[in-house]
């Protein structure tokens, strides 16, 4: 009977060691999965940052050319406004004098189509 209980003890110890090995293997597997997941996330993040950087560069190139056109149009508009202001200042007095002359200088005349019935 002692040999039987000794055999049972050996089986129990072997089962315990096997369970420990299985448990240790599961822990290693979980660590490897976790590490692989972290590496994959880091790689995805790096790729996303690279693509975002490329997008920003293309966006800046596209908007940069559009921005220079806008600046050019604004500059041209300011130049034209300056010219118009200069013309206005030069001709203002003359136009006002002519306008006042036409309004204030009234010469009554009989229209040529008017007939005197007599």
Swiss-Prot record:
<dbReference type="GO" id="GO:0006879">
    <property type="term" value="P:intracellular iron ion homeostasis"/>
</dbReference>
<keyword id="KW-0007">Acetylation</keyword>
<keyword id="KW-1003">Cell membrane</keyword>
<dbReference type="InterPro" id="IPR005124">
    <property type="entry name" value="V-ATPase_G"/>
</dbReference>
<comment type="function">
    <text>Subunit of the V1 complex of vacuolar(H+)-ATPase (V-ATPase), a multisubunit enzyme composed of a peripheral complex (V1) that hydrolyzes ATP and a membrane integral complex (V0) that translocates protons. V-ATPase is responsible for acidifying and maintaining the pH of intracellular compartments and in some cell types, is targeted to the plasma membrane, where it is responsible for acidifying the extracellular environment.</text>
</comment>
<dbReference type="GO" id="GO:0016887">
    <property type="term" value="F:ATP hydrolysis activity"/>
</dbReference>
<dbReference type="GO" id="GO:0051117">
    <property type="term" value="F:ATPase binding"/>
</dbReference>
<dbReference type="GO" id="GO:0005886">
    <property type="term" value="C:plasma membrane"/>
</dbReference>
<dbReference type="GO" id="GO:0036295">
    <property type="term" value="P:cellular response to increased oxygen levels"/>
</dbReference>
<dbReference type="GO" id="GO:0046961">
    <property type="term" value="F:proton-transporting ATPase activity, rotational mechanism"/>
</dbReference>
<dbReference type="GO" id="GO:0005829">
    <property type="term" value="C:cytosol"/>
</dbReference>
<protein>
    <recommendedName>
        <fullName>V-type proton ATPase subunit G 1</fullName>
    </recommendedName>
</protein>
<dbReference type="GO" id="GO:0097401">
    <property type="term" value="P:synaptic vesicle lumen acidification"/>
</dbReference>
<feature type="modified residue" description="N-acetylalanine">
    <location>
        <position position="2"/>
    </location>
</feature>
<dbReference type="GO" id="GO:0016324">
    <property type="term" value="C:apical plasma membrane"/>
</dbReference>
<keyword id="KW-0472">Membrane</keyword>
<dbReference type="GO" id="GO:0005765">
    <property type="term" value="C:lysosomal membrane"/>
</dbReference>
<dbReference type="Pfam" id="PF03179">
    <property type="entry name" value="V-ATPase_G"/>
</dbReference>
<comment type="subunit">
    <text>V-ATPase is a heteromultimeric enzyme made up of two complexes: the ATP-hydrolytic V1 complex and the proton translocation V0 complex. The V1 complex consists of three catalytic AB heterodimers that form a heterohexamer, three peripheral stalks each consisting of EG heterodimers, one central rotor including subunits D and F, and the regulatory subunits C and H. The proton translocation complex V0 consists of the proton transport subunit a, a ring of proteolipid subunits c9c'', rotary subunit d, subunits e and f, and the accessory subunits ATP6AP1/Ac45 and ATP6AP2/PRR.</text>
</comment>
<keyword id="KW-0375">Hydrogen ion transport</keyword>
<keyword id="KW-0406">Ion transport</keyword>
<dbReference type="GO" id="GO:0000221">
    <property type="term" value="C:vacuolar proton-transporting V-type ATPase, V1 domain"/>
</dbReference>
<feature type="region of interest" description="Disordered">
    <location>
        <begin position="19"/>
        <end position="42"/>
    </location>
</feature>
<comment type="similarity">
    <text>Belongs to the V-ATPase G subunit family.</text>
</comment>
<dbReference type="GO" id="GO:0030672">
    <property type="term" value="C:synaptic vesicle membrane"/>
</dbReference>
<keyword id="KW-0813">Transport</keyword>
């Amino acid at each position: 009977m002692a040999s039987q209980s000794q055999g049972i003890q050996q089986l129990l110890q072997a089962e315990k060691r096997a369970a420990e090995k299985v448990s240790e293997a599961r822990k290693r597997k979980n660590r490897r999965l976790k590490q692989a997941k972290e590496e994959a996330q880091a790689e995805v993040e790096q790729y996303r940052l690279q693509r975002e950087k490329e997008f920003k560069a293309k966006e800046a190139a596209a908007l940069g050319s559009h921005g220079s056109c806008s600046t050019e149009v604004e500059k041209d508009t300011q130049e034209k406004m300056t010219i118009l202001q200069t013309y206005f200042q030069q001709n203002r007095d003359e136009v006002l004098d002519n306008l006042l002359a036409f309004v204030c200088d009234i010469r009554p005349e009989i229209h040529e189509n008017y007939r005197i019935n007599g």
